[in-house]
Regions:
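Feature captures hydrophobic
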Residues: 1-109
Length: 109
């Protein structure tokens, strides 16, 4: 089990990068991370692609959901695990519009 908060904070920080803001222009969605090994849920709300807010809460109907273990998220973000391989092996599962999920790929990889 890995403490995911620093990794999620890193995702939020990356939203301030100008190139990422350009690719997220107008993006206002909610992204729920559900961790299978800890049972924890974290919510990131994106505001117009310019800002992201992290909170330790759940949302009944988020726009996007990522379901994974804390170790898998840490491995992907530390580049010890290939994100696409983890997805193909179903270590990372997603719910939501594929176009929106693809936009967020840059934040995790």
């Amino acid at each position: 089990m890995t403490d995911v908060q620093p990794y999620l904070e890193k995702i939020v920080e990356r939203v301030s990068v100008p190139a990422i803001q350009t690719s997220l222009k107008g993006f206002s969605k909610s992204l729920l991370f559900r961790f299978t090994d800890t049972g924890e849920e974290y919510l990131i709300r994106f505001v117009d692609g310019k800002e992201a807010v992290l909170s330790h809460e759940t949302l009944a109907k988020p726009d996007l959901t990522v379901i994974t273990s804390s170790d898998t998220l840490a491995g992907v973000m530390d580049k010890k695990i290939n994100g696409m391989t983890a997805y193909m092996q179903r270590k990372i599962q997603t719910k939501g519009a594929i176009e929106d999920l693809m936009k967020l790929q840059k934040l995790m990889l």
